[in-house]
Amino acid sequence: MVDESDKKQQTIDEQSQISPEKQTPNKKDKKKEEEEQLSEEDAKLKTDLELLVERLKEDDSSLYEASLNALKESIKNSTSSMTAVPKPLKFLRPTYPDLCSIYDKWTDPNLKSSLADVLSILAMTYSENGKHDSLRYRLLSDVSDFEGWGHEYIRHLALEIGEVYNDQVEKDAEDETSSDGSKSDGSAATSGFEFSKEDTLRLCLDIVPYFLKHNGEEDAVDLLLEIESIDKLPQFVDENTFQRVCQYMVACVPLLPPPEDVAFLKTAYSIYLSQNELTDAIALAVRLGEEDMIRSVFDATSDPVMHKQLAYILAAQKTSFEYEGVQDIIGNGKLSEHFLYLAKELNLTGPKVPEDIYKSHLDNSKSVFSSAGLDSAQQNLASSFVNGFLNLGYCNDKLIVDNDNWVYKTKGDGMTSAVASIGSIYQWNLDGLQQLDKYLYVDEPEVKAGALLGIGISASGVHDGEVEPALLLLQDYVTNPDTKISSAAILGLGIAFAGSKNDEVLGLLLPIAASTDLPIETAAMASLALAHVFVGTCNGDITTSIMDNFLERTAIELKTDWVRFLALALGILYMGQGEQVDDVLETISAIEHPMTSAIEVLVGSCAYTGTGDVLLIQDLLHRLTPKNVKGEEDADEEETAEGQTNSISDFLGEQVNEPTKNEEAEIEVDEMEVDAEGEEVEVKAEITEKKNGESLEGEEIKSEEKKGKSSDKDATTDGKNDDEEEEKEAGIVDELAYAVLGIALIALGEDIGKEMSLRHFGHLMHYGNEHIRRMVPLAMGIVSVSDPQMKVFDTLTRFSHDADLEVSMNSIFAMGLCGAGTNNARLAQLLRQLASYYSREQDALFITRLAQGLLHLGKGTMTMDVFNDAHVLNKVTLASILTTAVGLVSPSFMLKHHQLFYMLNAGIRPKFILALNDEGEPIKVNVRVGQAVETVGQAGRPKKITGWITQSTPVLLNHGERAELETDEYISYTSHIEGVVILKKNPDYREEE
């Protein structure tokens, strides 16, 4: 080490001994070498340019114009390639300061303008950061033809315009906040020059047409976004550029903050409308939720066939829009007819029974029903659900419709869901009302309630406009004194009229929702039904009635699980409405109740559904992190306690893992009462967990509290404290649950956000407490509904064997959501294995059967995807999925009130492509179906699908797939081949020989 340091010092000394005289010649030599390296042609060019600059310095003004023109020609002729700095710009760089001083001396405006034109291009290579000389001299020049300088120069100008505009905005903001209150004049000063907003905008509007003309649609949109003038874009767009411009704008929407996202959608809508692309325009109008815009699209054409095509697009969204001549299509009057045609063409008309998907004969273990203690009535109920989902919409089955005795193989409320499954089999077909009519005259209230619910399901989304049979049949039962009957009728109305904004339903159910004298169950059910009917409308009357319930209900009523559905109803009302929810959130925050924070999270998440807002997701993740930071000692104590607890659990492993599994906590408590040391450890663990701010619940805590109360003298005071703690605990539990669901809702909008959310869910599953872990699987299911990705359902499979049975049940249900309507073979196998694994645990087996039913929804012809190919969010579908997810915050509650699972029926739709001719008759056309490819911003005309298979309509279209016509024999009325598509013969088509 010493030797090395000595050597370094020696070299430093040697270098320091070299005199400056010896160093400078080296630099001069380098310069000489560079000059020598210039070719003869380059040297001549450099000399000529320097001569031209010298002429500009002379007093003879007659030479100025010719010299400037020569300079311009020289620069333009050399800028054919931008792989390196053009040589004239390189050679002129040292003269830039001289040319700037010449500009300041001259007085002739024409010559100054011409010189500013040259200086603007030179400033690209010389100008320092923050000076924006290129833009400054461009604005000082009157030369309008600046396009000849090339694409790179125009892009440089656009960059400086954006920077200057941002400086102006910041300056305006500073002026507004300044204490002297002086107002800004809308300009920004840079090196003594004032950039005015008007001049900058005028130049910007000169640049935009250049970008559009030279395949720079993205640059044009970005520039107008920078200067907040995106509404000025439509005037520059023509039939050659509008498609690429609008595709780029719509793709940008999930990445933009409000109100820019809405401005982009409205601008794209106006462009599509002006170019007569009506099907694209109506998709954006639905996305914006503006009925006036939808009407404008219909009014833009008088073609009745186009009106029908637009009506079919609206029908899939279950909107409340009314238009004369196509009302039966908008009301889904032909949906059942088209679906049965699909079933016939695909040879699916034969009914299936649940055993066809259970495949119990493949299970090597003992028969499910022979297992000790298994409730066969509950498994018959599960079969009713599976049968209803499996044969949904087919109007026939082998289990229930012709077998009146099947209903009585279930018990109590199970009969309600069993009868209601008939409505599921006849969904979208009013013939189901006749099948259910006979059950209305039965004495058992559960059976009658099932018939009422079934009527609502069979009429789901189908509206005649004049006569509403479901409303006529159900309206007399909503005020029935029997809660079972009234709740079923209310729920049936909610399913039947989801998304319809029907005023008659509002008038019927609002008094029930607003009444605080009725049981909270009835009021919550009425509020939920109204929210589904008026999803995403911000209806003031319903909002007021829900808020009244929060304010006027007793503390005991607000402890029930039904409160969650009141909060959910408020969220569904404001779904996708963004900032419009702010007033409601302010009102909620004024309520002094532990539930307040949880309600805010749920309502806020619903309002910003699909926005992909990163800041909101960060806020939710912050809520999910433990609030209190413990010292090292506490952490050490907790680790010790956990270690001891785990060792005891291991010691008692056999008893903990008894088949019932559901009562692990109880068994642990019993064992620890015997073992004094274990009891101390348990108490210690409880204390440290409370310090950490984590919520605790379950049989263990209740038993400990009972011991405390019996030994305590002041039981009354303790009781009050316990109640307050329970309320706070319930509020925290719900807040955590809603925050997890909120991440899924917000991330739905774009693919990158979905990928990131899945990573977050993995972390939450590892580090979250029990309440967070219970909701993570459901959130994963919502993010990938009807999209069975291997990485998602493999993760869910791991969670389905969790020690916490509630985590397992939610994971299994999420697997059903993930594969809803896909018939995915891998998922089907995993669910069959889970059915065998949980053959002795009846609740988990029930959920597994439900998941199997969802997987085989409509024999694989249905979907619950919340987006269509045009990226339009289906609010009715999302609201129906969210209802079951919120119910599963407490799986035991949903198992008791299983009829709420039928809310899913409101969001189910066929995933077919059905081709019709001008007359509305089905025709067979060859289409290519393949994986959708993102073509936004790509050059040329890239293929929109890859790995396609050619099929004849009708065909099924899964998540992430797209279709296109194979030949030009037919012309489509819609740009997206999805759902019902109307085609017309192409008069110019000739068959290839």
Curated annotation (Swiss-Prot):
PC repeats: 417-449, 450-487, 488-522, 523-563, 566-598, 778-809, 810-844
Membrane-spanning segments: none
Modified residues (Phosphothreonine): T24
Biased composition (Basic and acidic residues): 1-11, 24-34, 681-720
UniProtKB keywords: Phosphoprotein, Proteasome, Repeat
Keyword Repeat: yes
Gene Ontology biological process: proteasome-mediated ubiquitin-dependent protein catabolic process; regulation of protein catabolic process; ubiquitin-dependent protein catabolic process
Entry-linked InterPro entries: 26S_Psome_Rpn1, ARM-like, ARM-type_fold, Proteasome/cyclosome_rpt, RPN1_C, RPN1_N
Low complexity bias spans: 179-191
Extra remark beyond the main annotation: Present with 306000 molecules/cell in log phase SD medium.
Function comment: Acts as a regulatory subunit of the 26S proteasome which is involved in the ATP-dependent degradation of ubiquitinated proteins.
Name by which UniProt lists this protein: 26S proteasome regulatory subunit RPN1
